[in-house]
Amino acid sequence: KPQILFLESKGYSIIPVTNGRDAIDRCKTERVDVVFLDESMPGISGLEALAEIKRNRPSLPIVMITKNEEEDIMEEAIGSQITDYLIKPVKPNQILLTLKKIIDNKRLVSAKTNSDYQKEFQQIFSTIQDHLDHKQWTELYKKLIHWELELEKSSDNGMKEVLNMQKQEANVEFNKYIIRHYIDWIKGKDKDAPIMSHNLMAEKVVPVLKADPNTPTILVLIDNLRLDQWRTIQPMINESFRMVQDDSFYSILPTATQYSRNAIFAGMTPLEISKQFPTMWKNDDDEGGKNMHEADFLEAWVKKTFHGSIKHQYVKITNHRDGELLENNIMNYMNNKLTVIVYNFVDMLSHARTEMEVLKELASDEAAYRSLSVSWFDHSPLLNALRKLADKDINLLLTTDHGTVRVQDPSRCIGDRETTTNIRYKTGKNLNFEERDVYAVRVPEEIGLPKSRLSSSYIFAKENKYLVYPNNYNHFVNYYKNTFQHGGISLEEIICPVVKLSRK
């Protein structure tokens, strides 16, 4: 046959058989990389042969060739996990292209991705050096994430190293940008400021509630969800929902739950919260949980924003059992105007990864951390709960409170006994530190933060630095190196996803 001669001329070795039974036998005894299976053969049908081959060799790629364009035949073949489907008459070049897709796909994708990134490398480098505004920084970060996810498909570690260097350069410049503008943003002096934690509800939730008051709005906040993690779980969400708006906001400093999430639900800076709710706000050195009053802050925000209460509910998920209850009760929230669901898993994963050796191995870098997050989300009660809402008329908002960064460079820091233990930021008095490694704020009120003592100040670790005390310095350097932490200044911690979804 001309197809066989053509493929042999391209260097492929062909095993021709005339019926399904022979195909099954040869697949058992020969080293076969791909099977092209005619749907109509003497003896058993192509679909029957397909099922038998798959039983023996589940991962073997099989391409079905047929002249039958009936939908049910195609659906049955696709349901049997064929790799591709060709309709007769089949040209030799079609078979060649299919082979390249199957056998050479990884190599070809890797080569093309590397080539495309190389072409864009200089443009990204130039962009990093420009004077970017907050929107341009977000776009640059999204572009870096895009290439990070693309290069994951490549086996060329050299290109990944180049991209990591670009990310580090970007974070150096991003830190300068944040330090230059942050005080003006918090004080409301910069009209071009990004959406931030304390005005996220006003900018993203209020417009939805006012534009569509009769449709239930559900806000899901997955804590500690980086933008790249969102990108990897997004395809699972897209299966059930239509993306209406894919946006982002900037977390306030410190990029830590007690600050950013309380600010989100109160709709005010931590300094304003501490003044308005002095018994509810907890400073770092106070005892007790720091996020125990989110429902109270939300209640106060709703009353203030809507001049009276609307039917709303706050739900917090901190373990798998809570998640299962959420999945079972999700339809009850359709009776609320606003439902806020805080899902705590990713933050727990981040902290556990620091403390558990097995998780250090499972999430050794960003790619592994993303993979672990995808696996969790795919099997989580949260995804099951969202799927139950997929055909309902709702406004679904999904966001986070802050991101996280893999720390790699230790920086010495000295404080007194009251100084906080977080290794990405510190607050206390008499702080000694390496000036070049941190953003130091000696008047916390300037950036909307309360102080627990008259002389308290804050320092925030830059880029991928982490703050380590001199006592047992080497032990803690090694203990925390390459762990995921938050509280400081980096693209990964500050630029957060906020998306609006609706039913398809």
Please tell me what each predicted stretch does.
Residues 1-15:
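Two-component/phosphorelay signaling modules centered on CheY-like receiver
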Residues 5-6, 40, 64, 75, ...:
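Feature captures the catalytic ectodomains and active-site-proximal regions of enzymes
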Residues 18-22, 45-48:
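Acidic catalytic/metal-coordinating carboxylates
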Residues 25, 47-58:
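Short amphipathic alpha-helix used as the core "switch/output" element in two-component signaling
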Residues 30-36:
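Active-site beta3 strand of CheY-like receiver
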Residues 48, 69-84:
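Alpha4 helix (beta4-alpha4-beta5 surface) of REC/receiver domains from two-component response regulators
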Residues 65-69, 89:
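Conserved active-site segment of CheY-like receiver
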Residues 90-99:
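C-terminal output helix
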